[in-house]
Amino acid sequence: MDKKLSKDAYGGVKGKDYVPYITSGDKLGGNPVVMIAGIILAILFAASTAYSGMKSGLTVAAGIPGSIIGSGIIAAFAKKKGILGKNLLQGMSAGGETVASGLIFVLPAVLLIGAKISFIDGLAVGVAGVLFGVGISTLVHDYLLVEEHGNLMYPESLAISETLVASEGVGDSLKFMGIGFGIGGVIMLFTGAFLNKVNNIISYVNETFYKWRLEVEVSPMLLGIGYIVGMEVSLMMFAGSILANFAVLPLIGYFSSFAAEGATVWNNPDVAINAMKVGNIAGSYLRYIGAGIMLSGGLIGAAKLIPTIITSVKKTLSAKTAAKGTEESTGMSRIILLAGIVISFITGFVISGGNILMALLTTFLALILAMLFVIVSGRLTGTVGTSNLPVSGMTIASLVLVTLLFVGFGWVTPENNKSLLLFGAFIVTAIAMAGGYTQSQKVSMLLGGSRNEMSKYLTIASLVGVVTVVGTIMLLADQLVLTGADVQFALPQANLMATLTEGIISGRLPWGMIIVGIVMGIFFYLLKLPVMTVAIGFYLPIATTSIILVGALVRKFIDMTAKSEADKDAKLANGISLSAGLVAGSSIIGLVGIILQVTGVIKPSEITGFAATNYMAWIIMLILLVLVIGILLRAGVKNAEKK
């Protein structure tokens, strides 16, 4: 692993003078094998990101896992394509994941307001968002990636490029992903998501004077997410859950005990306030306080973007139309952008239900907002990477503006709310695509790949991702609309979008709790805490955030066992591959299980006896930890022996 990128990749030279890693020979990395493998990876990352993101509220950028796994695939099936083939596979992986991380923020909200999603509607807004996002990104490609080389670092692009350059050291990536897939799949097979044979929730709840709840869902998928995102994010999310379950929940429980007889919960007249249990408090109160914190975080994030928006627009307008030394004509880019605009207007007419004025005004506003935030998203990716891109903040700001347009014109029916959210799904997809595009194209620039080839492969993967994500959401529709404290899919961002738009349109938003959440968010911001991360932890079940923290702790432990920097790098690569497998295996098997349950092929029985106890869940936890830690430690020993 002694190969490195040139130091010029990190700056010090003008972008037009940068000499890429590959300077001679064929600049194309694609062939039918690479395309097929990329489509498979796009489907895999799109489905697993949609499933895990709707459950945990977190999405994991696929660029680095895709680069590691892609290295193994190219080594096994397309050696001649080398590093440029690996580059295309990481880009296609990112394309599938990027679409999912955008669409799941808004599209499920249509279901949450009681409306239905047609496959055509979901496909149309997704395709329009992909094409428009890629099209606008190509217009600022030279400015963001070439002219700003060294000023915008694109940290995750550099990490992906370094991983690909040193890819001889990660030849075991496919093996570790396969092991992770197997572990995740087998455990998921026996839990509620499939056969429902064993309990995998460790649960301790107190319903007396000091009400609290501590739970851990033994989930390979969530443990894998925790390993990938690391300690800082996991700890902040868990802090939000601690605040919700051990401070705010007991406080509400204490004061509710003094409520008068006959007083009932505001949204559930069958439950007396003085008799509320932990689940009632979580579902009727904590949820809306959490939504307020998320709203606060989103608006603060949007406000902080104002200087970036101004800078981005100014520099984009003043940038040279074409930097010298860039390759190929922009013909394909213009076609993609034009197709995105045309499909956007056609989609606008379809989802507006025949309201021509709504279609014209809202599509125009959505295109303006999407264009603005696509530029901002591409620039911010150069600073913080796609993993930390404030997509939710930009989406909330956009939705608030579109909602105000709807209210101003009197478009306030439930059907209008559905149209509003579908326009929002278009905007968020375009915003997310900008991050995926600029990050993948920066890798191509650093390595010496073809710009047009990456655009083509990335766009195809993203369109495949749209089909996959919309199909996944429709298959899971019955599970996604379930409400309560212990639902399988918490949908934090989609719930926020539904609550926000429906509340503004109907005027029935529980403002008292929302404002409490907003004030808490401002308090977190003043303490310099990541508001949205803490807010998601507050909103999610503690069972979800606790196992994510366990995954981060496992990574911390594995890192501590490294005997050298090289050993640490090898363990990190192995751990990410294994974790990607855990996420993919659990998600795919979970999806298959739900499909089989819905179609009546399998009928899970009720868990009874020892299999239903906390002891059973603890045993599964022990097995999972022993397998993951044991495999990674053993791999570290083998790596050391090889050296």
Residue spans of the language-model regions?
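Alpha-helical multipass membrane-protein architecture
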Residues: 1-643
